[in-house]
Design a protein with these regions (language model features):
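Active-site loops and adjacent core secondary-structure elements that bind or stabilize anionic groups
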Residues: 47-270, 286-304
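Flexible, glycine/charged-enriched surface loops at secondary-structure junctions
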Residues: 127-135, 235-238, 302-309, 339-350, ...
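Gly-rich Lys/Arg/Thr-decorated short loops/hinges at beta-loop-alpha junctions or inter-strand turns
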Residues: 93-105, 180-186, 260-280, 357-379, ...
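Short, positively charged and aromatic/hydrophobic N-terminal segments
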Residues: 4, 25-28, 32, 39, ...
Length: 464
């Protein structure tokens, strides 16, 4: 029934006057309700759309398209960290999610990696003024870098020497972040500080990866990424202007933890004013690399140590209970990065058509003490055209000894000088750490023994 109140002329009776008042009141309330409905129409439609897609995906429909999901407070996920952890979602208590899913269907861990890695590259860009990239696995970086140009050697060991497009600064940052620890970066989540361009998308498409987050994507770059993984590659766009609440919360075993966000600025010159070592000289490049190291550690599971050289992390030791184990783990990764530049490694005669992952694995074994696993008769023919010579222990030690100018950051103080002894073996000449150990004197003496310049920042960077 449609009521035309303008044409209605009821008899002037008390009963009809009550009817008229009822219709006017009902019509006014309905208009108010419709206005509120229209105000939230987009959000309601999107949430219903997401719920339908999520339920269909959870019920086994793998052809559900999650692209162009935006303007929402909540996104239901297939499951949490593990398939048995249901239900799962990400949501905002206030406002809308600062992301858009442009392609794919990211999962719980994908979003953890995406949001942690985005903070890292955003902060690197703000601190250095250069495009930055990170490669994340299990909520810690495997690599992080800024967009310095690549030498021919780095292009070769990062497997980008055959790319036909000119590498942009962002593409160089990505190649460095992905290439530093290729074994750990396998199946990573990528973060980019700047709009993803064709050159960067071209490099990403070649690697085994779960997804990428960036403030934007050129149409051509987005099309390249949409073709990856048979159209299921996860592409997330984030609002670069988004600022989270300064107070953050998390739950453990039903108990809610609350703390202020870690918003310490790590490009503050004051961080390098307390230098207790005899060598007090930090070059501009060393300060830049130490800043990169500290920012990387800020988003790495503790305990953590990070070796940096020429604008990129070359060894990250994450999540170890012992500080010396962090230093050893990260140092070993830095040594492998450096050994990959040895002439014997760069000239390995791989068979034609070897897959990138197989090449990575073969190099890793060839460099290690288990080199016979790829060099024994009946095995080497699977990887090489001819049997390579062994890279001897003496050759490896001599090559590693040539590495110089490495910067090292730690997310907390070094308790003993053994960390410095190990760092020195991997070419460390500059260190930034919190200080405050009862054995600071031992740590300082060990630095002086090798002429290492060390700054006490007074800042702890635990991340859990």
């Amino acid at each position: 029934m449609i009521f035309n109140i303008a044409a209605y002329k009821p008899p002037a009776t008390e009963k009809n006057l009550y009817k008229l008042a009822f219709f006017v009141t009902f019509h006014s309330l309905r208009l108010t309700f419709l206005k509120k409905m229209l105000k939230h129409k987009q959000q309601m439609v999107t949430c219903l759309h997401i719920s339908w897609k999520s339920s269909n995906f959870a019920n086994g429909n793998k052809n559900v398209d999650f692209s162009n999901i935006h303007n929402m407070k909540e996104l239901a996920l297939k499951y949490g960290c593990n398939p048995n952890q249901k239900p799962s979602r990400i949501y905002m208590d206030e406002g809308e999610l600062p992301i858009e899913v442009l392609n794919g269907r990211p999962g719980y861990i994908n979003f953890l990696d995406a949001l942690n890695s985005w903070q890292l590259v955003k902060e690197l860009k703000e601190a250095t003024g250069m495009p930055a990239a990170a490669s994340f696995k299990h909520v810690s970086p495997a690599g992080a870098a800024i967009g310095l140009p690549l030498s021919d050697t780095l292009k070769k060991i990062y497997f980008v020497d055959d790319v036909k497009v000119e590498l942009s600064p962002l593409a160089c940052a990505y190649a460095r972040a992905r290439g530093a620890d290729r074994m750990s970066s396998y199946g990573d989540f990528v973060a980019l500080s700047d709009t993803c361009d064709v050159a960067t998308a071209t490099l990403i498409k070649r690697e085994v990866s779960d997804g990428v987050i960036a403030p934007d994507f050129t149409p051509e770059a987005l099309q390249i990424l949409k073709e990856k993984r048979k159209g299921t590659y996860n592409v997330i766009k984030i609002d670069p202007a988004y600022r989270p609440n300064p107070i953050e919360h998390k739950q453990v075993f039903g108990v809610t933890f609350e703390q202020g966000r870690n918003e310490v600025k790590l490009d503050d010159p004051a961080l390098f004013e307390n230098i207790p070592t005899q060598n007090k000289v930090f070059t501009d490049e060393a300060k830049r690399d130490l800043i990169i190291s500290l920012i990387t550690l800020k988003y790495t599971q503790s305990n953590s140590v990070c070796y940096v050289k020429d604008g990129q992390a070359i060894g990250i030791g994450a999540g170890q209970q012992s500080r010396i184990h962090c230093t050893r783990l990260a140092g070993n990764k830095a040594d492998i990065w450096w050994l990959r530049q040895h002439p014997k490694v760069m000239n390995l005669p791989f068979v034609d058509g070897i897959r990138r992952a197989d090449r990575d694995n073969t190099i890793d074994v060839y460099i290690s003490e288990d080199h016979e696993d790829v060099l024994r008769d009946g095995t080497w023919q699977m990887f090489f055209k001819e049997k390579p010579e062994v890279l001897t222990m003496e050759e490896k030690k001599a090559w590693i000894a040539q590495n110089r100018g490495v910067a090292l950051g730690s997310d907390a103080f070094f308790p003993f000088g053994d960390n410095i002894e190990r760092a020195h073996k991997s070419g460390v000449e500059f260190i930034a750490q919190a200080g405050g150990s009862v054995r600071d004197d031992n740590v300082i003496d060990t630095c002086d023994k090798y002429g290492i310049a060390m700054a006490f920042t007074g800042v702890r960077l635990f991340h859990h």
